[in-house]
Curated annotation (Swiss-Prot), chain A:
The gene is GNB5. PROSITE patterns: WD_REPEATS_1, WD_REPEATS_2, WD_REPEATS_REGION. WD repeats lie at residues 61-100, 103-142, 151-192, 194-236, 237-276, 278-320, 323-352. This is Guanine nucleotide-binding protein subunit beta-5. The keyword Acetylation does not apply. Coiled coil: none annotated. One of its GO terms (cellular component) is membrane. It comes from the Eukaryota. InterPro entries: G-protein_beta_WD-40_rep, Gprotein_B, Guanine_nucleotide-bd_bsu, WD40/YVTN_repeat-like_dom_sf, WD40_repeat_CS, WD40_repeat_dom_sf, WD40_rpt. The keyword Repeat applies. GO terms for biological process: G protein-coupled dopamine receptor signaling pathway; negative regulation of voltage-gated calcium channel activity.
Length: 353, 456
């Protein structure tokens, strides 16, 4: 009996050292191709002009912290969710509310608009992701047609439709991501590998449309193959929870925002971190990030109520936007890149341009 | 109180990185040589030593971090809101005023229990409701050291009676700040509020004990990663430069958009002109079709023109096949067998009406896979056809008269002049919600008869 225990310990130790040495080799391989840095290459790029961005719309109507938002493909409608369970669909151009539903749970941390514009998905502390078809029929109660799709064993932190209304990708505090068939609620694929809560995800804008990236409390950003469920690439350079991940428009890289007050850019072909966006005066975590249409600008919302605008190529901070009166919890650029929307714990959403 | 499970006290999760960073800033602010200038501040008739003015704090932060005064003021305000700096005047509002208002640095944090106990003793048990709740809860929590708390409270009160008026005022402000930060009155926002507890899930607890499985997975991942090809940084980074510069004129937030940005001008003409299906696409839009095959396919107008072009070349079945495969991949699970069958009949079966030309090996593998249909069974065939179109048909399309004609015809909108009288109210047009419209005609309806061939 005693020898068996000893044997197990030795195997564990040797596995650990093997893993460590392989990781070291991987770092070496990555470093070999590191012939230049982004800011060096970007020296010959024209500097951006003065930036004047203002709040163009303020959406008031949530009675509590706004936690998440998503744009409709029509470039003007948005869906937003809050701590008190309310999910609202707005025409943000006119600021009219078009639909509202109250979820049976608090802290609705995830919401998404379906590609057709005919449904929304949301979830949070109920550990589920539910789909609501949007109806204009006055006689119909939106909550009546609700479809319960995803079931996790801890809170839902993020959700996104794939290329159609019929599939949803979810991320959860239970440490996994999952792909679901909306109609049947069937689990199509699950993704295991994060060592702690998964907080965010983003689908890759690729030609073959097969991968997505997720970020978690284990400080890792992981890229997954949707077909096989395998992790194809992982990056671990952040010093704290990763709150948000977003692909660069070409699909060759993605940005992340973390509680360590930095945003970082990871290149998928070079297989390494290529830029850090940080400043000594920025102390609070970045909660959400998104790129402008050309990928030149990175907008990041922070827990100190501000939004910082970064020059992706040169690495410098182009502008700081004040306005929100509490944490910025969510931020997305509109589908045609004419504006971006931020949601905050101050109960409001703002559209900036 | 915050919803969801709270982190256990003292756990690493509770040590948020921003608190440590703020502490470091505050420490450097108090540096005798490099820190903020300390002086004695006169407050009515009392003199308070070791105080700083709001404007000095703002100047110091602006210089230290090379930021604007607006940003320095914001950063300073955050430090005050968290109680690291407290006001000596009007301690009820935790604001940073960029003027002669005096502030001091918080020396000790903690002692909510002592504060409450002192208040209780002083006011002889007349605490406000929510204070009483906290007092009772604290009492329960630290019952075993409650005698110690009471003793400290009594001692401090005794000492306070003997202290100079100046010190008493300072201590009062200190404690008032502490109270405002850590136990704000109901309804007031708390800077210390966190979202639902993270890291409380079973996954983190289990994996914290790094098991053999965990290492085996890491080893497997590393082996696979080592086998992967990587690209030189210079190549990857150059790609960003060219992507950014190519797309720059198309980025409204960087280059503006014509006739105007709807959000700025309240005029939605830009959206009308760039609607998904429009008879006359703008020049920028037609240009984008030339950036990549993906951009062409993603634009409904671009795709329609490409479909017509393929029809003329008698290779329309390729795009239809690709669209059918997309429908399968992203369709409902229940539809999978039906869709696979339909695709086989139309595109792959020998003698099929719209037979696609795939290489024999891929065809063989695909037909083999069709025995057990699943949503990814056509992936290889789909990729083959996609690459065929991308490498062959697409470049020809860009060189074709059709495309060149479209490019020449496409117009550049005139800029809308800014409104001369900004106070003239302009109604914002609403648009019909996509949810109101009848089910949009899907471009992926390839399984219908003669879809997209352009044949009359």
């Amino acid at each position: 009996m005693a020898t068996e225990g000893l044997h197990e310990n030795e195997t564990l130790a040797s596995l650990k050292s093997e893993a460590e040495s392989l990781k070291g080799k991987l770092e070496e391989e990555r470093a070999k191709l590191r012939d230049v840095e982004l800011h060096q290459v970007a020296e010959r790029v024209e500097a951006l002009g003065q930036f004047v961005m203002k709040t163009r719309r303020t959406l008031k109507g949530h009675g509590n912290k706004v936690l998440c938002m998503d744009w409709c493909k029509d470039k003007r409608r948005i869906v937003s969710s809050s701590q008190d369970g309310k999910v609202i669909v707005w025409d943000s151009f006119t600021t009219n509310k078009e639909h509202a539903v109250t979820m049976p749970c608090t802290w609705v941390m995830a919401c998404a608009y379906a590609p057709s514009g005919c449904a929304i998905a949301c979830g949070g502390l109920d550990n589920k992701c539910s789909v609501y078809p949007l109806t204009f029929d006055k006689n119909e109660n939106m909550a009546a047609k609700k479809k319960s799709v995803a079931m996790h064993t801890n809170y839902l932190s993020a959700c996104s439709f794939t290329n159609s209304d019929m599939q949803i990708l979810t991320a959860s505090g239970d440490g996994t991501c999952a792909l679901w068939d909306v109609e049947s609620g069937q689990l199509l694929q699950s993704f295991h590998g994060h060592g702690a809560d998964v907080l965010c995800l983003d689908l890759a804008p690729s030609e073959t449309g097969n991968t997505f990236v997720s970020g978690g409390c284990d400080k890792k950003a992981m890229v997954w193959d949707m077909r096989s469920g395998q992790c194809v690439q992982a990056f671990e350079t952040h010093e704290s929870d990763i709150n948000s991940v977003r692909y660069y428009p070409s699909g060759d890289a993605f940005a992340s925002g973390s509680d360590d007050a930095t945003c970082r850019l990871y290149d998928l072909r070079a297989d390494r971190e290529v830029a850090i966006y940080s400043k000594e005066s920025i102390i609070f975590g970045a909660s959400s990030v998104d790129f402008s249409l050309s990928g030149r600008l990175l907008f990041a919302g922070y827990n100190d109520y501000t939004i910082n605008v970064w020059d992706v190529l040169k690495g410098s901070r182009v502008s700081i936007l004040f306005g929100h009166e509490n944490r910025v919890s969510t931020l997305r650029v509109s589908p045609d890149g004419t504006a971006f929307c931020s949601g905050s714990w101050d109960h409001t959403l703002r559209v900036w341009a | 109180m915050a919803a969801g499970p709270a982190p256990p006290p003292g756990s690493p999760r509770a040590q948020m990185p921003h608190l440590r960073k703020m502490e470091r800033v505050v420490v450097s602010m108090q540096d005798p040589d490099q820190g903020v200038k300390m002086r004695s501040q006169r407050l009515l008739v009392t003199v308070i030593p070791h105080a700083v003015t709001g404007s000095d704090v703002v100047q110091w932060l602006a210089q230290k971090f090379c930021v604007s005064e607006e940003e320095a003021l914001h950063l300073g305000a955050v430090l005050v809101q968290h109680g690291y700096i407290y006001p000596l005047r009007d301690p009820r509002s935790l604001m940073l005023r960029p003027d002669e208002t005096p502030y001091r640095f918080q020396v000790r944090l903690g002692g909510a229990a002592i504060y409450l106990a002192k208040k209780n003793i002083r006011k002889r048990g007349t605490l406000v409701d929510y204070e009483k709740d906290c007092y009772d809860r604290l009492h329960k929590k630290i019952n075993h050291v409650w005698d110690l708390v009471l003793m400290q409270a009594r001692e401090q009160l005794r000492a306070a009676k003997q202290r100079r008026k100046g010190d008493r005022l300072v201590i009062e402000c200190q404690e008032q700040t502490y109270w405002l930060v850590n136990r704000p009155p109901p309804g007031a926002p708390s800077v210390l509020e966190q979202g639902p507890g993270r890291g409380s899930c079973a996954a983190s607890r289990v994996l914290m004990t790094k098991s053999a499985d965990f290492y085996k997975r890491e080893i497997e991942y590393c082996r696979r990663a080592l086998g992967r090809t990587r690209v030189k940084s210079s190549v990857c980074l150059e790609a960003y430069l060219s992507f950014c510069s190519q797309h720059r004129p198309h980025d409204p937030l960087v280059s503006g958009c014509l006739p105007s940005n709807p959000w700025i001008s309240d005029n939605d003409t830009y959206w009308v002109m760039n609607a998904p299906t429009v008879a006359a696409p703008t020049k920028l839009r037609v240009e984008r079709w030339g950036f990549s095959f993906r951009e062409l396919l993603e634009d409904p107008v671009g795709r329609a023109h490409f479909t017509d072009f393929l029809g003329k070349e008698f290779s329309g079945e390729n795009l239809s096949f690709w669209e059918a495969c997309e429908e399968l991949r992203y369709g409902a699970q229940a539809q999978v067998p039906t869709l696979v069958e339909a695709v086989y009949e139309q595109f792959l079966a020998p003698g099929a009406a719209r037979w696609v030309n795939i290489d024999s090996r891929t065809m063989e593998q695909t037909l083999e896979g069709l025995r057990q249909p699943h949503r990814y069974v056509l992936d290889d065939a789909q990729l083959h056809i996609y690459m065929l179109m991308k490498k062959d048909s697409y470049p020809r399309f860009l060189k074709s008269d059709t495309y060149k004609g479209l490019l020449a015809e496409a117009g550049i909108p005139l800029e809308t002049k800014r409104r001369v009288f900004p106070f003239m109210w302009r109604p914002r047009h609403s648009s019909p919600s996509p949810a109101l419209l009848p089910t949009p005609v899907e471009l992926t309806a390839a399984c219908g008869p003669g879809g997209g061939d352009g044949v009359a």
